[in-house]
Regions:
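Flexible "cap/lid" loop of the alpha/beta hydrolase fold
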Residues: 179-208
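N-terminal cap/lid subdomain of alpha/beta-hydrolase-fold enzymes
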Residues: 56, 60-116
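Alpha/beta-hydrolase
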Residues: 198-290
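Conserved acidic catalytic loop of the alpha/beta-hydrolase fold
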Residues: 133-152
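Catalytic His-Asp charge-relay segment
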Residues: 289-296, 320
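Catalytic active-site module of serine/aspartate enzymes centered on a nucleophile-bearing elbow/loop
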Residues: 318-350
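Conserved alpha/beta-hydrolase "acid-adjacent" motif
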Residues: 301-307
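Conserved hydrolase catalytic core segment
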Residues: 150-189
Length: 350
């Protein structure tokens, strides 16, 4: 089991930048690694000894605090003004952007089980099964550590939306509002089917000593579920070319390039942990009493519109916002203009 490999001490804050003459929307940047209660009990059984959670808080602490969490590839660096390419939500979050950091302080963290500096599996290690509830409990412990009694909102997309719902069920008094984008109270069986094939591919490759190759293939398959059929038709409807006696279709270059990129930065074990966690996700929506805005993308193959309409019907205090995007499930990364109106509700301003 892997702990942090960070260059700062546990339970101590590293001040990345001060608030002296800050850039607008930035303020101080602080990050650290929190030692979670040990052993940390897990929802599906077992526990994690000496578990650690890496976090990053950007902005004026006097502003409303918004927790921003995304898909299983997301991490604590939501945006970064000095190294923009490092921010996983860089097209949506920042000063003057859809999620405007001039109006809130932003808290991110590395998921348990994921690539990053939180506790996760080592190479060839079978990690305990993780639930979205486990991530929610880690977030609650982080808020205790930072002495934040109540946050303004959680903006959660994809897996992050699942964690937001789990937090809302378990710790509703600690958050004023949830924004859930492309995430339901449970996984759709067809989406689980796609992910189960991906996981089987990775496990088979690990047994053959070729885990990275298996992850590359799994990611290539996953890419076919993230975008809409309209986008694939617009981008890749061209004849194949003959390469080395074999036909290569235009879409293959895209899929396998994305697969190689992913396999170069993510370990197979980390992918397996969080992919499984998505499919284990199941919360009781009737117990999420926090006001909740649910954003559904009509073209989303992984989280169908009908599922989110049903979720909103079960949530006691919820509204549904429907958008349309050729980016499908990835719309939360690519549609700042459509998302800005819902982000504008998060700051608590009159």
């Amino acid at each position: 089991m892997r702990g942090c490999g960070a260059a700062w001490e546990l339970d101590r804050v590293r001040l990345v930048s001060s608030n002296s003459d800050p850039q607008p929307g930035r303020g101080p940047v602080r990050e650290g690694v929190l030692a979670l209660p040990s052993p940390l009990p897990l929802h599906h059984g077992g526990s994690l000894p000496a578990a650690q959670l890496a976090w990053r808080l950007v902005g004026d602490p006097a502003l409303p605090v918004v927790v921003a969490i995304g898909g299983i590839s997301a991490h604590r660096r939501v945006f970064d003004l000095e190294q923009p390419e490092q921010g996983w939500w860089r097209e949506v979050v920042g000063p003057g952007q859809a999620l405007d950091t001039r109006r809130c302080a932003l808290l991110g963290f590395d998921y348990l089980g994921a690539q990053g500096d939180s506790t996760a599996a080592r190479a060839d290690e079978r990690f305990p099964s993780l639930s979205s509830y486990d991530q929610a409990e880690a977030l609650a412990a982080l808020l205790d550590h930072l002495r934040i009694a109540r946050i303004r909102a959680i903006a959660g997309a994809s897996y992050g939306g699942m964690v937001a719902l789990a937090f809302g069920e378990r710790h509703g008094r600690r958050v004023e509002r949830l924004l859930v984008i492309s995430a339901g109270d449970r996984a759709h069986p067809l989406a689980t089917a796609w992910r189960s094939v991906q996981r089987r591919t990775v496990r088979f490759a690990l047994q053959a000593g070729r885990g990275a190759d298996g992850l590359e293939l799994a990611r290539a398959l996953a890419m076919t579920t993230y975008r809409s059929s309209e986008e694939f038709a617009a981008r890749f409807d061209a004849p194949p070319r003959l390469v080395g006696g074999e036909f290569v279709f235009p879409v293959e270059d895209y899929l396998y390039a994305r697969g190689r990129d992913y396999a170069a930065r993510v370990r197979p074990e980390h992918f397996l942990s969080l992919s499984e966690s998505i499919d284990l996700h199941r919360v009781d929506a009737t117990r999420v009493t926090v006001p909740c805005t649910v954003v559904a993308v009509r073209e989303d193959l992984l989280v169908p519109l009908g599922d989110l309409r049903a979720l909103v019907a079960r949530l006691p205090r919820a509204e549904l916002v429907e958008i349309s995007s050729p980016h499908g499930h990835d719309a939360f990364l690519k549609e700042p203009a459509q998302l800005k109106p819902v982000f504008d509700t998060l700051y608590g301003e009159q």
